[in-house]
Regions:
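Residue-level detector of Asp-centered blade-edge/turn motifs that repeat once per structural unit
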Residues: 346-347, 424-425, 471-473, 525-527, ...
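Short, conserved, GDST-rich strand-edge loop motifs in beta-rich repeat architectures
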Residues: 356-387, 434, 439, 478-495, ...
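Asp-box/WD-like beta-propeller blade repeats and closely related beta-sheet repeat scaffolds
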Residues: 438-501, 506-520
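Beta-propeller blade signature
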Residues: 176-179, 390-396, 443-448, 493-506, ...
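Beta-propeller domains
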Residues: 308, 315, 357-413, 437, ...
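Multi-bladed beta-propeller domains
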Residues: 332, 401-415, 446-464, 502-517, ...
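Gly-Asp-aromatic-enriched flexible segments
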Residues: 17-188
Length: 696
C-alpha cells in the first residue's frame, strides 16, 4: 500500500506525456518550482539557526547584487508564536561604494507583524532594545510570524544584521530568513483558484507566501508529520513519509507529500467526527424524539440499525488508509447526521446566523474575529469596528447534503454584525453594526432582505447603542455608553455599557442601570422580567464577579438571579431562558483574562441553587461528568470545544456556534443534553455565530 503512493505517480511521469487536468497540488508544485528557481539564482533563501529567547544575537548577511527586493522574514519556531519578538539589530544595506543606510532609516513597502506594529530602535515598551543583554542603537523589531519587504531596485550589494529576540521575550523562538522574492500576488492567485484546499493547508503553516518560497520539501513533510501526531495510529502515515524521503527530486517529493497530506487530513477529520459518534447518546435522543410530534420513527429506525452495525464493526481501518474503511466511516457520520437532524424542532428548515468570511485565517480564528469584544470585561464599544466581511444569512435544506445559504443583509462599510436577535413575529431580526460615523447602533432587517433601518435615534453625538433586545410591547432595551465611565483597571480605556429603555414611537430614552461596570445581554425571561449579566468591580474580587441579574422591563427590582457571592464561574455570558421553565437558562461560562467571550456550555437552574456548581444542571456535552468548581483567572484556556451564542430549541436541544478543537473552524451545531454534537454548517474560509431557528 505504501509503495503504491510513490510508484503510481512515477509510472505516470515515465510514460508518454499526457494533458493533465490542473489541480491544487499540481498548481502548487509548479508555482513553488518557479519561485525556487528565482531564489536559487540569487543564492537565496538564507536561513538562521533556531534562535531562542535570551540568546545572544547571531550575525546574518546576504549578497544583494542585482536584486530588486529584500525580504526579511521572522518565522515562529515549533513552540508557537508567544513572545516571538524577532529583531533585526544593527541591520544595514551597503552600496557598491561602501556607503550604507541603516534599515531603521527605511520604511518597508509591505509588512506584516504577528503582533502589533513593527518597532524601530526600541523594544515593545519603548525602552532601549537589548538582545542577550547587549544594547543596540539600531534595530527593527517584527514579531513572528512576520515579514518586511523593501524595494531596493538594485541599489545595494550587501545586507548585514545581527538577529535575535528582544530581551522582553522570556520565552519564544524565531527562525530568521532573508529572501529576494515575496510571492504575495502568487499566493493570492493560488488561494483564489483553490480556496478550500489552500485555506485548510494554511492552518498548518506560517503563511502561504513563506510556504511557497521554501527551498525543499521539509515544510510538506512537517505538515504531514504534524497531522500524524494527532492520530491514534500513525504507522501508515509515517511509513509513507519514509518512502517519500527516498525520492531525490524535490518537486516529486512535494507532490507526494501533498497527496499524503490530503489523505492524512481526511483521516484526521474522520477521527474527530467519530469521537463525537456516541451510540448511547444517539439512542437517548432517538427515543426522546419519538415522543415529539412530527418525528417519523419508522423512517429513521433502519438508519439507526445500520449505524449500530457500523459502530459494532469499528473504524480502525481508517488508520491504514483503506478506502473502503474511509467510505464506511463517512457513511456512519452521515447516518448519525440523518438521525439527529430529523429532530422536529428543525422542521421549519431555516436557521438565521451571522457569517464572517475569514479566508486563510479561518482555522486560527476565535470569537473576536466573529465580531465580539476582544476580552471579557468590555462592551461592544471596544470591539473592532471595521475590516470585516460579514453578513446575515439564512440557512435552509438543513437535512440535505448541500445546505443552502441565502444572504439577507451585508453591511456596506465593513462593519461586523453582532448581537443577532429574532423578533417575536419571526419575520425580522435586530442586530448591532456601525453607522457611517463609526458609532455603534441597533438596526433591523426583514428576513426577505427588505426593511433595513436604524432602530434607536438620538441627537447626542457621542452616544452609542448595542446589545439590544425586543420587548413584547414594542420597546427596546439596549446597552449604551450613557454613563460616560470606563473600566478602572485599564485607566478607563474600555467604555462601560449600562442599559437604556427606548420607545421607538416617541424616541424617549431612559437609563435603567447605574452600575460602575458593564451590563451584557439583556433578554426577556418567560415570566416577563429581563435577565442580564452585570459585572461589578468595587469591593469585589473583580476577576470573578459577573453576576446574572434580573429586573422588571422598566428597570425596577434589580436582583441577583445566579452567581452572587461565588467565585465560580468568573463570567456567564449569552444567557437564554429555557422554553417552558420559570428559572432555568443556558449560558456560556468563561474567564476574566485569556480566551475572550467563548467557553463552556452550561444549563443552569437557580431554583436548585443560586451560585456555584450546585446551580448548574449539566455541562453540554458532558452529562455524566461532574462540574468541578475551579477558581482560575483564565478559566477556559485550553478547554475544547469552545461554544458561543447558544439558542434553546426546547429544554433539551440547542443551536450553538462552536469550534471543536484548536485546528477547527467555527460552525453551527445542534447539541443536546444527551451529549450529541451534530454539525449543521461549517465551511472552509468562513466562521458562523449567533444561530437562531426561524419559527413563527
Amino acid at each position: 500500500m505504501v509503495s503504491l503512493l510513490l510508484s503510481t505517480s512515477l509510472l505516470v511521469s515515465a510514460g508518454p506525456k499526457q494533458k493533465k487536468v490542473d489541480n491544487w497540488i499540481d498548481a502548487s508544485v509548479k508555482q513553488k518550482s518557479e519561485l525556487r528557481a528565482s531564489l536559487v539564482k540569487a543564492n537565496m533563501p538564507i536561513m538562521s539557526a533556531w534562535i531562542k529567547a535570551k540568546q545572544k544575537a547571531v550575525p546574518m548577511s546576504a549578497d544583494l547584487t542585482g536584486l530588486d527586493q529584500l525580504v526579511l522574514v521572522t518565522a515562529a519556531g515549533p513552540d508557537g508564536t508567544d513572545w516571538d519578538w524577532g529583531t533585526w539589530a544593527n541591520a544595514r544595506l551597503i552600496k557598491a561604494d561602501g556607503s550604507s543606510v541603516w534599515l531603521d532609516e527605511l520604511d518597508p513597502d509591505y509588512w506584516v507583524s504577528g503582533s502589533g506594529s513593527i518597532r524601530k530602535n526600541t523594544d515593545l515598551y519603548g525602552n532601549p532594545l537589548l538582545i542577550g543583554g547587549k544594547k543596540y542603537d539600531h534595530s527593527v523589531l517584527c514579531h513572528a510570524n512576520g515579514v518586511m519587504v523593501y524595494n531596493i531596485n538594485k541599489e545595494y550589494v550587501r545586507f548585514e544584521a545581527e538577529v535575535g529576540l528582544a530581551d522582553q521575550s522570556t520565552v519564544g523562538s524565531v527562525f530568521f530568513r532573508i529572501m529576494n522574492v515575496f510571492p504575495k500576488e502568487e499566493a493570492a492567485r493560488l488561494l483564489a483558484a483553490y480556496p478550500k484546499e489552500l485555506g485548510a493547508l494554511n492552518a498548518n503553516i506560517d503563511g502561504l507566501e513563506n510556504w511557497l518560497t521554501a527551498s525543499d520539501a521539509s515544510a510538506e513533510r512537517d505538515i504531514v508529520l504534524n497531522l500524524a501526531s494527532r492520530l491514534k495510529d500513525a504507522a501508515y502515515v509515517k511509513n509513507a513519509v519514509k518512502q517519500i524521503e527516498t525520492e531525490k527530486d524535490i518537486d516529486t517529493q512535494i507532490r507526494e507529500y501533498l497527496k499524503l497530506y490530503e489523505k492524512t487530513q481526511r483521516i484526521c477529520n474522520l477521527q474527530s467526527d467519530l469521537s463525537w459518534l456516541n451510540m448511547e447518546a444517539i439512542r437517548l435522543a432517538f427515543n426522546d424524539m419519538k415522543k415529539l410530534k412530527g418525528f417519523d420513527a419508522t423512517k429513521y429506525q433502519p438508519v439507526l440499525d445500520e449505524l449500530e452495525q457500523q459502530v459494532k464493526k469499528g473504524f480502525d481501518g481508517i488508520y491504514s488508509g483503506d478506502e473502503a474503511a474511509l467510505v464506511n466511516a463517512e457513511k456512519a457520520i452521515a447516518n448519525k447526521r440523518t438521525i439527529l437532524l430529523a429532530n422536529p424542532f428543525l422542521d421549519g428548515d431555516k436557521v438565521l446566523a451571522a457569517r464572517f468570511k475569514l479566508g486563510v485565517n479561518a482555522h486560527k480564528a476565535m470569537a473576536p474575529d466573529l465580531g465580539t469584544q476582544g476580552n471579557n470585561w468590555s462592551n461592544q464599544e471596544s470591539a473592532r469596528r471595521m475590516g470585516f466581511d460579514a453578513d446575515i444569512v439564512e440557512l435552509s435544506n438543513l437535512r440535505g447534503e448541500d445546505v443552502q445559504v441565502r444572504s439577507i443583509y451585508k453591511p456596506e462599510n465593513g462593519s461586523s454584525v453582532a448581537d443577532l436577535r429574532m423578533h417575536w413575529d419571526g419575520d425580522r431580526a435586530m442586530f448591532t453594526q456601525t453607522m457611517p460615523d463609526k458609532r455603534w447602533n441597533v438596526f433591523e432587517v426583514k428576513l426577505d432582505g427588505s426593511g433595513f433601518k436604524q432602530l434607536i435615534h438620538n441627537e447626542e453625538p457621542d452616544l452609542e447603542f448595542y446589545d439590544g433586545t425586543y420587548l413584547p410591547d414594542g420597546r427596546i432595551i439596549a446597552n449604551s455608553n450613557i454613563g460616560y465611565q470606563g473600566v478602572p483597571c485599564v485607566s478607563g480605556d474600555d467604555p462601560v455599557g449600562n442599559m437604556v429603555l427606548y420607545t421607538p414611537d416617541t424616541k424617549n430614552l431612559r437609563r435603567l442601570t447605574f452600575d460602575q461596570d458593564a451590563n451584557w445581554n439583556p433578554v426577556v425571561m418567560n415570566n416577563g422580567r429581563v435577565m442580564y449579566t452585570r459585572w461589578e468591580y468595587t469591593d469585589l474580587t473583580h476577576y470573578y464577579s459577573r453576576i446574572v441579574m434580573n429586573m422588571n422591563p422598566d428597570g425596577t427590582e434589580q436582583k441577583a438571579l445566579y452567581g452572587s457571592g461565588s467565585m465560580f464561574p468568573n463570567s456567564t455570558f449569552d444567557i437564554q431562558p429555557l422554553p417552558g421553565h420559570g428559572s432555568a437558562f443556558v449560558g456560556i461560562i468563561s474567564g476574566h483574562h485569556g480566551i475572550a467571550r467563548s467557553g463552556r456550555l452550561i444549563v443552569f437552574d437557580p431554583a436548585k441553587a443560586r451560585k456555584g456548581a450546585a446551580g448548574m444542571v449539566q455541562e453540554i456535552p458532558y452529562r455524566n461528568r461532574p462540574i468541578v468548581e475551579e477558581i482560575k483567572d483564565e478559566l477556559v484556556n485550553g478547554v475544547w470545544p469552545q461554544f458561543i451564542k447558544p439558542t434553546p430549541l426546547n429544554d433539551k436541544y440547542f443551536l450553538v456556534a462552536a469550534k471543536l478543537d484548536p485546528q477547527d473552524l467555527w460552525g453551527i451545531y445542534l447539541v443536546d443534553v444527551f451529549d450529541n454534537v451534530t454539525c449543521l454548517r461549517k465551511v472552509e474560509g468562513e466562521g458562523y455565530i449567533s444561530p437562531v431557528a426561524v419559527r413563527k
